[in-house]
């Protein structure tokens, strides 16, 4: 199904969550309000999921009543991911979750995404090779907007040109 021309709310209603590269949070709203804006169904199941998310991202619990604009870059990224994940979407599109984050924060975000991938399908766009190779099952190498290769990490590593040119492995 083609969804490019659909309004954002229609895409969300179809069970697709999106985490933009720029984090897309409301800086003037508290963490709690940012989460409430994202929630489509306020029911017991959503409340359980919210508890699960707050365990995945304990920093969000600490800053629950603080404006999103006061969060660090990593905390904003966690909030952005949490907002997309709270509605039990069938598909999460996550764009560059490690961009601009300190290595320790990248690790926390990566661990959280690893836990989430057991419960939902995730399409991850990521230039951080370590993060992508840890999280991913199936990989697409895109160069200048074109898919130049795809497969498992094992398959990609077997291709000497792919290793040298795209994976940064000598």
Segments from the language model and where they lie:
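ABC ATPase C-loop
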Residues: 84-85
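Catalytic Walker B motif of ABC-type/P-loop ATPase nucleotide-binding domains
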Residues: 92-96
């Amino acid at each position: 199904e083609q969804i490019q021309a659909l309004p954002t709310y229609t895409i969300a209603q179809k069970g697709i969550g999106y985490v933009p590269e720029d984090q897309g949070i409301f800086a003037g709203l508290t963490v709690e309000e940012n989460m409430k804006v994202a929630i489509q169904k306020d029911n017991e199941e959503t409340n359980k999921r919210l508890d699960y998310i707050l365990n995945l991202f304990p920093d969000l619990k600490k800053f629950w009543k603080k404006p999103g604009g006061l969060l660090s870059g990593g905390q904003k990224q966690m909030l952005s991911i949490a907002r997309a994940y709270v509605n039990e979407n069938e598909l999460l599109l996550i764009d560059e979750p490690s961009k601009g984050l300190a290595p320790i924060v990248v690790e926390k975000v990566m661990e959280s995404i690893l836990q989430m991938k057991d419960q939902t399908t995730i399409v991850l766009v990521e230039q951080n090779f370590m993060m992508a190779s840890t999280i991913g099952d199936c990989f697409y190498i895109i160069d200048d907007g074109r898919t130049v290769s795809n497969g498992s990490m094992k398959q990609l590593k077997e291709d000497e040109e792919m290793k040298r040119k795209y994976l940064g492995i000598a």
